[in-house]
């Protein structure tokens, strides 16, 4: 991470979008703090603060694909924020990724190009894993 402009990437190395975002940050010259949240886990307060900073509700940050198998009750309309946060703390895979935090704010970086809004500089060109040039 650069001293004057810290970048934190909440990262899942199995996710192509997350890998692209991390590579974009590094290509822009940053050395980010990488948090592999599947290993470190979350707590509800940490998630609440991160989502508030990113302007997300817990439901908006919920990865529905994983919720279908890990916690299908969260997909019901009556599932509240507290239940979603508790499930995310218990099953970190339920949090959509990647989330990036910088002095400019925090965001769920889907699509991956959203990360550029959080950086002071960007690479001149970047080629994603799938060959797309951004």
PLM region spans:
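Local sequence-structure signature of Cys/Sec-based thiol-disulfide redox active-site neighborhoods
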Residues: 2-28, 32-40
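Thiol/selenol-based redox catalytic cores and closely related redox-interacting motifs
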Residues: 39-134
């Amino acid at each position: 991470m650069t001293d004057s402009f810290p970048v934190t990437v909440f990262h899942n190395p199995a996710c192509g979008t997350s890998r692209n975002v991390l590579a974009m940050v590094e290509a822009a010259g940053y050395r980010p703090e990488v948090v592999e949240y599947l290993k470190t886990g979350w707590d509800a307060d940490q998630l609440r603060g991160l989502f508030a900073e990113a302007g997300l509700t817990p439901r908006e940050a919920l990865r529905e694909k994983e919720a279908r198998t890990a916690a299908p009750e969260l997909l019901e309309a009556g599932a509240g924020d507290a239940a979603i946060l508790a499930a995310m703390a218990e099953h970190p895979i339920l949090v959509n990724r990647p989330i990036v935090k910088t002095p400019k704010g925090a965001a769920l970086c889907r699509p991956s190009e959203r990360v550029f809004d959080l950086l002071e500089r960007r690479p001149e060109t970047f080629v994603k894993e799938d060959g797309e040039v951004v």
